């Protein structure tokens, strides 16, 4: 007969690795072509002039300039553009 009660096993202890999403360059900061501006899931921020969008919705600078954030349109969408300095 067992003199020790069987130990339970936990079903917790898993968590996904953080994806380091968010704004990488803020309004007024200088950007060079190819710089990542925003890493995001979906289009929380939309690409304005001088900004490209990757297949994972990452926004990046297409040319050198200064970052500008603005809201436009009837749905108040957030746009990011690169304005030449």
Curated annotation (Swiss-Prot):
<dbReference type="GO" id="GO:0022625">
    <property type="term" value="C:cytosolic large ribosomal subunit"/>
</dbReference>
<comment type="similarity">
    <text>Belongs to the bacterial ribosomal protein bL27 family.</text>
</comment>
<dbReference type="InterPro" id="IPR001684">
    <property type="entry name" value="Ribosomal_bL27"/>
</dbReference>
<keyword id="KW-0687">Ribonucleoprotein</keyword>
<dbReference type="GO" id="GO:0003735">
    <property type="term" value="F:structural constituent of ribosome"/>
</dbReference>
<dbReference type="InterPro" id="IPR018261">
    <property type="entry name" value="Ribosomal_bL27_CS"/>
</dbReference>
<protein>
    <recommendedName>
        <fullName>Large ribosomal subunit protein bL27</fullName>
    </recommendedName>
</protein>
<dbReference type="Pfam" id="PF01016">
    <property type="entry name" value="Ribosomal_L27"/>
</dbReference>
<dbReference type="GO" id="GO:0006412">
    <property type="term" value="P:translation"/>
</dbReference>
<keyword id="KW-0689">Ribosomal protein</keyword>
<feature type="region of interest" description="Disordered">
    <location>
        <begin position="1"/>
        <end position="21"/>
    </location>
</feature>
């Amino acid at each position: 007969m067992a003199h020790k009660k069987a130990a339970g096993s936990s079903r917790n202890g898993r968590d996904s690795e953080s994806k380091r999403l968010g704004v990488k360059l803020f309004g007024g900061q200088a950007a060079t072509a190819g710089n990542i501006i925003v890493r995001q899931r979906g289009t929380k921020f939309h690409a304005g002039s001088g900004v490209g969008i990757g297949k994972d919705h990452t926004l990046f600078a297409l040319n050198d300039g200064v970052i500008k954030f603005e809201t436009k349109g009837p749905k108040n969408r957030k746009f990011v553009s690169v304005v030449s300095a």
